[in-house]
Amino acid sequence: MALNSSHVAVHYNAGFIVLSYLVSLVGCITTLELLQRRTSRRGLYNWYLLVASCICMGGIGIWSMHFIGNRAIVLNDGNAGSQILYSGGFTAASFFLPIVVLLVAFYLLGVVDRGNWYYIAASGLLTGTAVCGMHYVGQLGISNYNIGYHEQNVVGAAIISVVASFIALSVFFKLRDTWTDSWWKRSLCAAVLAGAVSGMHWTAAVGTVYHYRGTLKAPSTRSREQTVIVCAVLVSISRLQFDHG
């Protein structure tokens, strides 16, 4: 939709910004740990690790980061009835979208043990697409605002997500054979990958304007609280996967 001067004032809660990055980092660390454990000799278990890594990255590293990050967005000077609420359909779709895309991306990286630049580039592009796709589908789920975007932020966010994803995945998959016992090196790659997710999110967020749908009834805050609870459950599952995957 077109941007105009009637948009609602926005400011940000620093605590939720930091928390959203840390949640993404947990998801990314778990994802790379699970991918590290994949080998060419373990069929069904390899598929389990692939699916689990996609759920951790898509559901926690991307989806949970997005919705916790959106809790940092404070609209209309904090008025309780003016904060972002979500509809169920697009919110659910935004959860499954990155998981499906990442299944393709991470499968490509497992086609050859050491990876090659073509597969890594394709995987980086798909991962960046998963991040962007989740963000904008998730935004479609906002039920009490019409949303507008600055084009330069949309483009910049896409570039950040693709480039940073490519860097993190290329370093990880080219060097993972020498990183079997180097958890801190995998953590650094995860930090870059989480930076791709967070960088994309906040670049897009600062270029977003919110136009309140004044015809709506005063909303309940239940959808906001439910989303945070779901994110907390997913992070807990990620921890269990890390310990027992």
Enumerate the predicted regions with their spans:
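Peripheral, non-catalytic segments of secretory and membrane proteins
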Residues: 1-245
